[in-house]
């Protein structure tokens, strides 16, 4: 598997390293972006392409009484997101699903906010998604 393919859909041991690198490497831009978005303390948010779950954690912090769902099509990413957000998942404030942006299991109008941090360039068809 090439480096680029492992950024798109992390797999195996190299994928675990990639997900950790993304959690760290994407932090500054994600934190900056979140300063420009109004998120209420009880919002229901979706993070498409949640990767290693760092942005789920940020959204949970900005919406302490809200509920956050993350979805990613990489099994490695889903596992890391669940591990990083275990407490919020146990509290019922967070859910992490494995799935594809092209076939989301809910309607778009279900959420107050839908985010996609550094992921849309991997989507096969942005207009359809």
Task: For every predicted segment, state its role.
Residues 17-18, 29, 33, 55, ...:
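Hydrophobic alpha-helical segments typical of transmembrane helices
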Residues 127-129:
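A short glycine-rich, Lys/Arg-flanked "PGG" loop and its adjoining helix->strand segment in the class I
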Residues 24-43:
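Conserved alpha-helix/loop element of class I SAM-dependent methyltransferases that forms part
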Residues 112-125:
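A short SAM/SAH-binding and catalytic strip from SAM-dependent methyltransferases
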Residues 1-15:
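N-terminal, positively charged/glycine-rich alpha-helical extensions of SAM-dependent methyltransferases
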Residues 35-40, 61, 104-105:
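Glycine-rich helix-loop-beta junction characteristic of Rossmann-like nucleotide cofactor-binding loops
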Residues 102-113:
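A short acidic, Gly/Pro-enriched loop at the edge of an enzyme's catalytic core
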Residues 44-103:
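Class I SAM-dependent methyltransferase SAM/SAH-binding core
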């Amino acid at each position: 598997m090439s480096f680029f393919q492992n950024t798109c859909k992390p797999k195996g041991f190299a994928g675990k390293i990639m997900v950790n690198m993304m959690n760290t490497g994407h932090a500054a831009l994600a934190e900056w972006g979140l300063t420009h978005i109004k998120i209420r303390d009880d919002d229901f948010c979706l993070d498409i392409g949640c990767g290693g779950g760092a942005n789920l954690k940020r959204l949970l912090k900005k919406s302490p009484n809200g509920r956050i769902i993350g979805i990613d099509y990489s099994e490695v990413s889903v596992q890391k997101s669940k591990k990083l957000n275990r407490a919020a998942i146990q509290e019922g404030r967070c859910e992490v699903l494995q799935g594809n942006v092209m076939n989301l299991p809910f309607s778009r109008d279900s959420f107050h906010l839908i985010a996609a941090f550094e992921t849309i360039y991997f989507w096969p068809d942005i207009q359809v998604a």
